[in-house]
């Protein structure tokens, strides 16, 4: 797990692994989540439908982006423009899992936002 996310401490990697897998009947292990729904919407929504949904969100919205994430910055790639009242906060030293990579900084951002 640390190979995939070098920001994780050994303790975090162990915790996520222990709580993120199920043991199969044959003794092997499988992730609890379904990799097939990670890339696409589980509801079969098109990109246009997703953008229309974002456009209906009227409450203040905080998009937190780890600067070392594999995902694009929502401001740079245009996703931000679909929201009525959103802002992007970029976090140094964090990948896609900002809440794992920089927990205290993430919590501070969240508290300030709320």
Identify the residue ranges that each predicted region occupies.
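C-terminal alpha-helix
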Residues: 109-113
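Conserved loop-alpha-helix segment in the C-terminal half of the alpha/beta-hydrolase fold
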Residues: 56-94
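A broad structural signal for alpha-helix termini and local helix breaks/kinks
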Residues: 4-5, 84, 114
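Short beta->alpha junction loops/turns
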Residues: 2, 6, 68-69, 96
């Amino acid at each position: 797990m640390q190979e995939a996310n070098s920001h994780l401490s050994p303790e975090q990697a162990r915790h996520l692994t222990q709580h993120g897998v199920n043991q199969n009947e044959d003794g092997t292990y499988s992730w609890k989540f379904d990799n097939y729904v990670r890339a696409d919407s589980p509801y079969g929504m098109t990109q246009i439908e997703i953008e229309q949904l974002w456009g209906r969100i009227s409450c203040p919205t905080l998009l937190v982006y780890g600067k070392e994430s594999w995902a694009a910055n929502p401001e740079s790639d245009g996703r931000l423009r679909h929201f009525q009242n959103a802002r992007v906060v970029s976090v140094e030293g964090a990948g896609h899992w900002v809440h794992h990579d920089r927990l205290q900084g993430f919590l501070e951002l969240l508290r300030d936002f709320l």
